[in-house]
């Protein structure tokens, strides 16, 4: 009898450990969708990208640059062409990490490109929001404004030099 109870307990424990919760399934599905969108973005596969985003898709570039703002699909395509015109060569990026939730995931990458101002290596965080139909409805992008301005726009940023010994006094 003890063996039967022990065997039953082990079987139930094994089955409960092997079952993925609904939440985990949703997180995995979100991550899969987001990585497909990310790959399509980076490779320039507009057809695949379009098939994975919602009809009310928006993309938001944070910051204080002239290109910062929220774009719908058509204006995002125009923005992408403009961004590409600032580069020498292709868009490049090294995926570094992803943090996924049930309805959104944040992808971290190191952009590795060359712009009119020289080498452009900017750290990016992109939050992809996935709607109830499994389509990406919004991408929100964070990056260094200053690096973009100097390396892609060719602007010079000059600040006042502060003596390190007097900086916080």
What is each of the regions a protein language model found here?
Residues 17-51, 159-169:
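Short, low-complexity N-terminal intrinsically disordered segments enriched in polar/charged residues
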Residues 51, 55-101:
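A solvent-exposed, acidic/Ser-Thr-rich amphipathic alpha-helical stretch
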Residues 85-89, 113-121:
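Short, cysteine-centered beta-strand-loop-beta hairpins and adjacent loop/turn segments enriched
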Residues 93-98, 123-130:
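Hydrophobic/aromatic beta-strand elements that line small-molecule binding cavities or substrate pockets
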Residues 138-169:
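Low-complexity, intrinsically disordered terminal/linker segments enriched in charged
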